[in-house]
Structure formats: structure tokens, C-alpha cells
Amino acid sequence: MAQNKMTQNKTTQKVIITHFNSRHDFLKLLENNPGLVIVKLGATWCGPCKRIKPVLDGFFASSPDNVICCDIDVDECTDLYSYFKSKKMVNGIPVILLYKKGNVNFFPDDSITGADPVELDKFFKRCGLHLKSLAPALSVREQR
């Protein structure tokens, strides 16, 4: 079962998932993806992870309801992180993975590794483009 915490925005609360008990729980989340799932893998002892935290928190807090945000500590979710490493999907932390609606496997649609502010900005802009590309498909489904 996924565990989460609430972050307080000025007018709304955003749920951020902070733990998966198993890889199976992660796949269940992807199966119920309403638009995008964004997963940051990091650790409390990781300097670059600490540097990107304010940027990541800001993005998570301002993300729309069809974006599921996950901030996962690799020392607490060893099963998931070990699996990502064994499949060569991650090679260090921090890493942020993006999953679009319909992607129900472990391989992300987009990702970024590291704490470069310019590259982070580019990644979050790509997240916005992915959301815009989903908007017509979501509104057509909602009309049915």
C-alpha cells in the first residue's frame, strides 16, 4: 500500500506519496494514473537531493489534480529502488521519473538525473507539455 503525506498550498492540499511497500503497489498506482505520475527518488543524506527540494516542492504543490506526485526515499523503499537499478533505469540520485497515463510498466516516459537547475527547468517544462498533450484525450473521454 502506498503511504502519503499532505502538503499545504495556499488554497488546496496536495497529496504526495512517500512510500511504496512493494513494486506491485507502484504498478497499481500506474494503472490508476489520471494523467501523469512524477516520482522523485532521493535520500535524506543526499546533498543534490536537498538542493532540488525547494524546486520540487514548488512544482508538486502547484501541480494539477491529474498529476500524482511521489517523493520516495531510496533507503526506505529498497525494493522499488533496487528494481529500478537492476533494470538500469536509474544510476544515481536524485532522479525524477515521469509516467504518462497508459504507461503501466516500470520504464518511464521521461526522466532526469542530477540537480542541474537548467535541466530541472527543462524537465518540468516537458511535464507541462505532456499534460497539455493529454488534455484533448481526457476531455473527449469525459464527454462520453
Sequence positions of predicted segments:
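The canonical Cys-X-X-Cys-His
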Residues: 46-49, 96
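N-terminal "domain-start" segment that seeds a small globular fold
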Residues: 1-28
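Non-catalytic, surface beta->alpha helical segment in thiol-disulfide oxidoreductase systems
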Residues: 91-92, 97-142
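Short active-site neighborhood of thiol/selenol oxidoreductases, capturing the structured segment around
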Residues: 32-43
